[in-house]
Amino acid sequence: MEGPEIQSAEAVIDNGSYGKRVVRFETGRLARQAAGSAMVYIDEETSMLSATAVGKHPREGFDFFPLTVDVEERMYAAGRIPGSFFRREGRPSTDAILTCRLIDRPLRPAFGKGLRNEVQVVVTVMSIAPDEIYNTVAINAASMSTTLSGMPFQGPVGGVRMALMAEENGGHQWIAFPKHSQLENAVFDMAVAGRVVTTKDGGQDVAIMMVEAEATDNAWELIKGQGAVAPSEELVAEGLEASKPFIKALCDAQADLAARNRKPELDLPRFGGFGDDAAQAVEQFVGERMAQVYSIAGKQEREAATDELHHDTLAELTGEGKPFEGRADEVNGAYQALTKQTVRQRILKDKVRIDGRGLTDIRQLSAEVDVLPRVHGSALFERGETQIMGVTTLNMLKMEQQIDSLSPVKHKRYIHHYNFPPYSTGETGRVGSPKRREIGHGALAERAITPVLPSREEFPYAIRQVSEALGSNGSTSMGSVCASTLALYNAGVPLRAPVAGIAMGLVSDTVDGEVQYAALTDILGAEDALGDMDFKVAGTREFVTAIQLDTKLDGIPASVLASALTQAREARLYILDVLTSAIDAPDEMSEFAPRVISVTVPVSKIGEVIGPKGKMINQIQEDTGTDISIEDDGTVYIGATDGPSAEAARSAINAIANPQVPEVGERYLGTVVKTTTFGAFVSLTPGKDGLLHISEMRQLNDDKRVNEVDDVLSVGQKVQVEITKVDDRGKLSLAPVVAGSDSDAASDDEN
């Protein structure tokens, strides 16, 4: 029996010295009863099946396009059995949900306007290499199956992950589809999606439709410790341009396969269109009322007025015996179009927005900390009618989130949860488990803060941040970033820098025969709905930490995007001033927060600390009222409700594993075991090292400033040192002891 005809096309992604990646599209073999299906491979190891199905009839009562995107992570793809009780995949992982949103955002605006037939895209991850990140590959898979389906679809859409790699001598390079291990040397990471469009001069360009970006976990260390380039607004714009050739290659491969295999375009009914007579009737009836309504500053008052105007328009034009009876859909479409035109023309011509602000004006800001009793950290951030409460909770590292998904990341200690109750917009609705939007907003705020978190060694706590959206009128996600900075500082978390976020918008229209653009700072909910772009930017004073961009336009001029980025930076710096005026450094930890300290024991002593069947460690926990966890490298974390209990547990552990604990003032002839840009690590005794900071090395260099540690000390060299400090985690700070120095003389005097 002759098998099915299988056809394929591929895109070669050339990253220069970083190697090549090959994305292959295949159709005709699997899921042949779906409207469109495709297998997509990257380097032949990671593969996924995408299938697009189309409903036969329009959904009644829907005034939007019913598109559903689902991502199925199969554990067999990684050679694993699910960890659930029934050993079967259950609800989607957070990674899968975020990938659904990543696919939906560029695909949805590419469908024909007015469609009401239900469309479902299901992407199933069939196999995955351990070091692979599959989410942007899934965008291409979903686009391929949809392009083949015959749906009215202005695709194909290409998706690519770009990483800003830090190179020697401060250089950098953007690479496509980085592997997870490569991100350790990257300072910025972004997913970009777009499609090929025809320019006015007949050429081709790539219209960017979606961006999801963040600074990496290692960005701070790479920038501050190794001199890597910081991800500025200019570099982000450079990365977007660098992504375009890769997106075009992916779109070209899809178009090649679609040209040979696409089904005839489906003839589906369209809704929401309207004739010229309906447009004229709506404009004549509404008159100046539309402009007056959209000049009301208050959200609730404006919404009440718009509801009344909308109701009056329908009653007057579509009621029984009225000229447009039975044509309510047309009148609705004309009304929405007039609303959009009224708002846009006022912004572009008069430079005045809905609430009377100028294009770059920020609404009134308010920042307050310590707003709830007993919690570990809390804050309230308000921007106009948007109100966010942030609450921080600290616990031991063993409470960090364990991740059971196909992601190479298996745990995380910083968790951001975002809640959006219906009362935040003055409405009723379901409450309970989070919806996809809440998960997406929480993930965006989490990515914005992650690059400035202290290391596990500096702050050995699991951190849960919750953002409660108590009032919503524009960018609660960026409000959550601001509230998180405040609450984390209030909880005593030593952030490396404060982070603020701002939501930008863009409107465009033809004015006097010319297309004009206007970037809006701090957009309202209505400006988001009626505009062309939603652009969220978060960052510190020095660099960008997270970006999310969605646009409805077929390409944004580079100058317009650069201007919007600069405008966003100015707004971010202003908001940071407000945040730091409320709190500019970590507070003392709450008395209700657990105290977590650490001690290092030799790996060979771990068994002695635990004892037979856990007898020893259980006895210490019972005697001291503490909670103890031991890492494989010998790091012991001790959690307690108060400091004395934690110290008692540490003393008990030291008595077993470190019977001789160094104290301040003790001197050792140590051996240099490692040099860094900021100092040298000196081994005092087996398993006990200390840091000799570069600022302490003057005495070893004739009291002259030391610029390079290696000019004074080298690995293996012996050096006489004195312990000057033992911090609460048992870390030692050292100073050199030189014959004839002040410290040596003082010691001789005491003797």
From Swiss-Prot:
Its main location: cytoplasm. Coiled coil: none annotated. It catalyses: RNA(n+1) + phosphate = RNA(n) + a ribonucleoside 5'-diphosphate. It is an enzyme of class 2 (transferase). Residues 594-653 form the KH domain. It is found in: Cytoplasm. Its cofactor is Mg(2+). GO terms for cellular component: cytosol. The keyword Transferase applies. Its EC number is 2.7.7.8. GO terms for molecular function: 3'-5'-RNA exonuclease activity; magnesium ion binding; polyribonucleotide nucleotidyltransferase activity; RNA binding. It comes from the Bacteria. The keyword Lipid metabolism does not apply. Mg(2+) binds at D528, D534. Belongs to the polyribonucleotide nucleotidyltransferase family. Involved in mRNA degradation. Catalyzes the phosphorolysis of single-stranded polyribonucleotides processively in the 3'- to 5'-direction. This is Polyribonucleotide nucleotidyltransferase. It comes from Kocuria rhizophila (strain ATCC 9341 / DSM 348 / NBRC 103217 / DC2201). The lineage of its organism: Bacteria, Bacillati, Actinomycetota, Actinomycetes, Micrococcales.
